Amino acid sequence: MFQYKHTANNQYQTGIFLAILSCIVFGARGDLISTEILATRNVINTQTYIEEELAQIVTDMFAIDPAQYGYWLYKITYETIDIHGNIHIATGTVSYPRVDWPDVPDQAFPILSYQHGTVVEKSDVTSVIGEWILPAILTGAGYVYVEPDYLGLGDSEGMHPYQLKEPYGTAVVDMLRAVRYYAAFENEQFVVNDQLFLAGYSEGGYATMATHQIIERDYSDEFDITVSFPMAGAYSLSGIMTDVMLEQQPYGQPFYFPYILFAYLNFYPSIGTVEQYLLPEYVFLADWFDGYHSSGEIN
C-alpha cells in the first residue's frame, strides 16, 4: 500500500529511491512525463459552473450537494505499454480539490478514476476538450478525479484497442501511478490517501470492470479498491454482444462492429485479416479508424 506524506527532510531521498525502484520493478511504466494546467476555479466559481452546466441538461428537480472545493484541472502525460508490451506515451486528466482558505491542516483526498464512454476521435477526450461537468462535481465533493484517455486517444498514437481488457487495465494503472507520483513528489499542495474508487460508463463500464480484475490479479499489493461501480458496459462480449452484432437487424450505431473487429484483428493477428471478415466494398473502413474520423462519418 502506498502512503504518501510530504516532509522537507526525506522528499528528495524518497524520490530518488522511488525512481530507482520504478526502473527495477516497473520499467518506465507509470513514469510522469509532463503536466499542463487546463483550468482552475475557486469554490464559488466551481459551484456557479456546475449550476450553469446542469441547467442545460437536467430539470430543476435534480439536485446535488454544493461544491466544497474548487479545482485544478491538469493534463497528464505519462508512460505505459502498448498492446505489444512496448513503452508507449499516453495522456489523461487529473482534477485536484483546490483549497483557498488559510490555516487548513493537510488534507489527503481519495482518488476516483473515471473511465469514459465510447469515442472514436482522438480529440474527443477531456485532455483535449478541457473542462466538463463531471470532474467539477466530483472534485468539488472532495475527490481527486482521474480520467485516462486510453491508448490510441488523446496524444497516444495508433489505433484505440476498443473493448480489449489488458490495454484498459495497464493504461489506467499506469496513470494512477503517475498521479500518485505527482501528488507525492512534484506538487506539495496535492496529498492523496489510499482510497481508490473506480467508475465508468458504456465503454468505460467495461474498462472499469477490466481494470478492477487486473488490479486484483496483478497489483493488489499496490492498490486497494475501495468501491468499484462499472455502468452499462458490454461485459458479455462472446455472448450477448456477439448475438447483437450478428443478428439480421439494422443497428443504430453500426460503427461499433468494425471498431471492435479492427481492434481485435490488431491485437490478435492470428484470427485473420480484414478481407476475411468484410465484403470488398467495406474493407476501406479500416483506414477510417485512425482517430481522425467521427462515428457519424463512419456510420
Please give the residue ranges for each predicted region.
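Gly/Ala-rich beta-loop-alpha elbow adjacent to hydrolase catalytic centers
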Residues: 200-204, 208
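Conserved alpha/beta-hydrolase
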Residues: 135-155
